[in-house]
Amino acid sequence: MARGKAKEEGSWKKFIWNSEKKEFLGRTGGSWFKILLFYVIFYGCLAGIFIGTIQVMLLTISEFKPTYQDRVAPPGLTQIPQSQKTEISFRPNDPQSYESYVVSIVRFLEKYKDLAQKDDMIFEDCGNVPSELKERGEYNNERGERKVCRFRLEWLGNCSGLNDETYGYKDGKPCVIIKLNRVLGFKPKPPKNESLETYPVMKYNPYVLPVHCTGKRDEDKEKVGTMEYFGLGGYPGFPLQYYPYYGKLLQPKYLQPLMAVQFTNLTMDTEIRIECKAYGENIGYSEKDRFQGRFDVKIEVKS
């Protein structure tokens, strides 16, 4: 038994290092060199093919515009303040209850202040009334960064924060700022006037993508009360001259147009679901994405 065990251990040691043949794990130094060289060349070629394929693919992709733009979903509609569970609940006589909503609006509108839009090399005035789309050339850097249209806070009226730093919350008349999410190259197509006959209160303009808010359910519609809309030129929507958006590389300071709605007569102590929708020929809605082209928010003004 002892001899067999010693013989077995000796055979393993000899396999690991054979001093007679100068072999390590059954191979000589030259053999190990050849096999290592083979694998270095083999995997080097694989890496080269992979890198080359990636480089060729990158040559077909623009860093300024997606290749398959037609597969991008329509933009979503978003409200500010953005609160947990999209609920706004507060007491007008309790500043702490609405402080977070006010802070959210203030922070968002910081970049819309006049001081932030002073640089004439970046910003330009695009008019005080809605107008047609403002094309700024191809999506490349041949012309460098593109200019950005200024957006004045004063166009948001009672919801601008210029005259009321609480945006109506201290009076129980909360403001909600509405924006259309950025989609590179998106060109809004406003609906035809006749398609808005269902909403006679909407102020129509062929150069505005309109937005309308109403109660989500029948019982909500009775409790929403009156609403005041604010936007460029007095139109509740997004003027076309702010589109298309050219992306972060070409328009790093881009300001999307805003509008605001103020709920001036909400039924007190009642949770009201309100839905706001953008209307346009290329605005879509999805049951899977409740923010695509619309949003709904619950608002409760407590006594």
UniProtKB/Swiss-Prot annotation:
Query: Which residue intervals are topologically Cytoplasmic?
Result: 1-34
Which residues are recorded with the post-translational modification Phosphotyrosine?
Answer: Y101
Q: Which keywords describe this protein according to UniProt?
A: Cell adhesion, Cell membrane, Disulfide bond, Glutathionylation, Glycoprotein, Immunity, Innate immunity, Ion transport, Membrane, Phosphoprotein, Potassium, Potassium transport, Signal-anchor, Sodium, Sodium transport, Sodium/potassium transport, Transmembrane, Transmembrane helix, Transport
Q: Which GO terms describe its cellular component?
A: apical plasma membrane; basolateral plasma membrane; intercalated disc; lateral plasma membrane; organelle membrane; sodium:potassium-exchanging ATPase complex; sperm flagellum; T-tubule
Q: List the disulfide bonds.
A: C126-C149, C159-C175, C213-C276
User: Where is the protein found, in the record's own terms?
Assistant: Cell membrane; Apical cell membrane; Cell membrane, Sarcolemma
Extracellular compartment segments: 63-303
Sorted alphabetically, which Pfam families does this protein's record hold? Answer: Na_K-ATPase
A molecular function (GO) term: protein-macromolecule adaptor activity
Q: Which residues cross the membrane?
A: 35-62
**Chain positions with Phosphoserine modification:** S11
Positions annotated with a glycan in the UniProt record: N158, N193, N265
Q: Give the record's PTM text.
A: Glutathionylated. N-glycosylated.
Location of the region described as immunoglobulin-like in the Swiss-Prot/TrEMBL record: 191-303
User: Where primarily located?
Assistant: membrane
The annotated subunit structure for this chain is: The sodium/potassium-transporting ATPase is composed of a catalytic alpha subunit, an auxiliary non-catalytic beta subunit and an additional regulatory subunit. Interacts with catalytic subunit ATP12A. Interacts with regulatory subunit FXYD1. Interacts with regulatory subunit FXYD3. Interacts with NKAIN1, NKAIN2 and NKAIN4. Interacts with MLC1. Part of a complex containing MLC1, TRPV4, AQP4 and HEPACAM. Interacts with KIRREL3. Interacts with OBSCN (via protein kinase domain 1). Interacts with TRAF3 and TRAF6.
Query: Belongs to which family?
Result: Belongs to the X(+)/potassium ATPases subunit beta family.
| PANTHER family with a match to the protein in the record | SODIUM/POTASSIUM-DEPENDENT ATPASE BETA SUBUNIT (PTHR11523), SODIUM_POTASSIUM-TRANSPORTING ATPASE SUBUNIT BETA-1 (PTHR11523:SF10)
Q: What is known of its domains?
A: The C-terminal lobe folds into an immunoglobulin-like domain and mediates cell adhesion properties.
Q: In its UniProt entry, what is this protein called? A: Sodium/potassium-transporting ATPase subunit beta-1
- Species of origin: Sus scrofa
